[in-house]
């Protein structure tokens, strides 16, 4: 009879510190919204009452990067805007995550010219890519759910996994 069985008989729940910390991180993510183009409209739609991102622990959007732990880059990033994105990312406390929302944020989209960064991952490390032009709110919610799963697998030591790419939304609307 192991300690887990004895603890279970006494009504004691056993878990690891990593599980508890990661559960807290997933249920209290505070996003810094960085809407740069048409994807920002869909990002706002995801926070409306139809989809309600507060179900996922995102009650408030943060205007200050010092209070945020998730940056959602929605839209194309110009070369002039890239240092601002990097500065905001650097001001965020650890642990921090980035979602690239839309084709423009992921790979430059249809704007293949000198003025547009061909993917925000040239500026900041991206954890989840959400495809679409613009992606629907369901796709952003899928990306957030995938990020939650990724955070639950992380070690407290801070070693991060490789990025997740979402090509098709997991949630289907009828």
Swiss-Prot record:
Cofactor remark from the record: Binds 1 [4Fe-4S] cluster.
Membrane topology: Peripheral membrane protein
UniProt KW keywords: 4Fe-4S, Cell membrane, Iron, Iron-sulfur, Membrane, Metal-binding, NAD, Quinone, Translocase, Transport, Ubiquinone
EC number(s) from the headed UniProt entry: 7.1.1.-
Binding site for [4Fe-4S] cluster: 38-39, 104, 133
Cofactor: [4Fe-4S] cluster
A GO biological process held by the record: aerobic respiration
Keyword NAD carried by entry: yes
Catalysed conversion reaction: a quinone + NADH + 5 H(+)(in) = a quinol + NAD(+) + 4 H(+)(out)
Subcellular locations according to the entry: Cell membrane
GO cellular component: plasma membrane; respiratory chain complex I
Subcellular location, principal: membrane
Membrane-spanning parts: none
Membrane among keywords: yes
InterPro entries: NADH_UbQ_OxRdtase-like_20kDa (IPR006137), NADH_UQ_OxRdtase_20Kd_su (IPR006138)
MF annotations from Gene Ontology: 4 iron, 4 sulfur cluster binding; iron ion binding; NADH dehydrogenase (ubiquinone) activity; NADH:ubiquinone reductase (non-electrogenic) activity; quinone binding
Family: Belongs to the complex I 20 kDa subunit family.
Function: NDH-1 shuttles electrons from NADH, via FMN and iron-sulfur (Fe-S) centers, to quinones in the respiratory chain. The immediate electron acceptor for the enzyme in this species is believed to be ubiquinone. Couples the redox reaction to proton translocation (for every two electrons transferred, four hydrogen ions are translocated across the cytoplasmic membrane), and thus conserves the redox energy in a proton gradient.
NCBIfam families, per database record: nuoB_fam, PRK06411.1
Assembly notes: NDH-1 is composed of 14 different subunits. Subunits NuoB, C, D, E, F, and G constitute the peripheral sector of the complex.
Protein name (Swiss-Prot/TrEMBL): NADH-quinone oxidoreductase subunit B 2
Organism: Chloroflexus aurantiacus (strain ATCC 29366 / DSM 635 / J-10-fl)
Gene of this entry: nuoB2
């Amino acid at each position: 009879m192991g300690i887990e069985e004895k603890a279970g008989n006494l009504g004691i729940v056993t878990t690891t510190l990593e599980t508890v910390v990661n559960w807290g991180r997933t249920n209290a993510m505070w996003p810094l919204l960085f809407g740069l183009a048409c994807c920002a409209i869909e990002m706002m739609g995801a926070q409306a009452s139809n989809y309600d991102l507060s179900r996922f622990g995102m009650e408030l959007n943060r205007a200050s990067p010092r209070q945020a732990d998730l940056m959602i880059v929605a839209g194309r990033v110009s070369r002039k805007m890239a240092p601002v994105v990097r500065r905001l990312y650097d001001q965020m406390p650890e642990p921090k995550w980035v979602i690239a929302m839309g084709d423009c944020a992921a790979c430059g989209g249809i704007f293949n010219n000198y003025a547009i960064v061909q993917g925000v991952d040239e500026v900041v490390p991206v954890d989840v890519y959400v495809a679409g032009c613009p992606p629907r709110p369901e796709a952003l919610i899928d990306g957030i759910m995938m990020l939650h799963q990724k955070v639950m697998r992380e070690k407290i030591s801070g070693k991060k996994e490789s990025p997740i790419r979402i090509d098709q939304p997991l949630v289907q609307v009828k």
